[in-house]
Amino acid sequence: MLQPKRVKFRKVQRGRRDGAAHKGNTVAFGEFALQSLEAGWITARQIEATRRAITRYIRRGGQVWIRIFPDKPITKKPAETRQGGGKGAPEEWVAVVRRGRIMFEIGGVTPEAAKEAMRLASYKMPVKTRFVARDVPAAAEETEVAEAE
C-alpha cells in the first residue's frame, strides 16, 4: 500500500475538492491514460486495486505508471466515542484528485488492450473517468509517413 515515509504534519484539514487540475492533466510517460472527470479522494487501497487490475490484464506486455500518490492522512475517531477530545487518529491515506487529472498511464500495448485495461481499472475508481490517448503532434506524423515511403 502506498503512503509517505514521513510527513511534516500528522493531521491535515479536509480542504476543498472543487476545481480542475492545472498540473498532471496531460499524458506524460505512456501512450494511454485514465483521466478523472470529477474531483474526489482516492484511497491507497483503491489505487492498489486499480494497479492490480491493469497489470493483470496487460500481463508482461506493457508498463504502468501511477501518476497519483496518497499523501493526505484521513483521521477517524473510534466507534461509540463522545465528541470532543481532539481530532481522531490517522486512519488511512488518500490522494486528492481534481477534475482532469491523469491517474494511470500505460505504454507498450495495443490501443484495444489499453482501452480494456482502463475499462477494468475504472470500475475500481470512486470517480468518473475516461480513456485518453497521447496527442501525436502533426510534425511527428509527417516524419513517420516520410520514413514509410
From Swiss-Prot:
UniProt cross-references to InterPro entries, sorted A to Z: Ribosomal_uL16 (IPR047873), Ribosomal_uL16_bact-type (IPR000114), Ribosomal_uL16_CS (IPR020798), Ribosomal_uL16_dom (IPR016180), Ribosomal_uL16_sf (IPR036920)
The record's PANTHER family line, in alphabetical order, gives: 50S/60S RIBOSOMAL PROTEIN L16 (PTHR12220), LARGE RIBOSOMAL SUBUNIT PROTEIN UL16M (PTHR12220:SF13)
Q: Name one Pfam family in it.
A: Ribosomal_L16
Q: Which CDD domains match?
A: Ribosomal_L16_L10e (cd01433)
Q: How does it assemble?
A: Part of the 50S ribosomal subunit.
**Which NCBIfam families does the record match to this protein?**
rplP_bact
What does the record give as the function of this protein?
Answer: Binds 23S rRNA and is also seen to make contacts with the A and possibly P site tRNAs.
Q: Which family does it belong to?
A: Belongs to the universal ribosomal protein uL16 family.
Gene Ontology BP terms: translation
Q: Please provide the record's keywords in A-Z order.
A: Ribonucleoprotein, Ribosomal protein, RNA-binding, rRNA-binding, tRNA-binding
Q: Which residues cross the membrane?
A: none
GO cellular component term, pick one = cytosolic large ribosomal subunit
Does this UniProt record's set of keywords contain Ribonucleoprotein? yes
Protein name according to UniProt: Large ribosomal subunit protein uL16
Q: What are the recorded GO MF terms, alphabetically?
A: rRNA binding; structural constituent of ribosome; tRNA binding
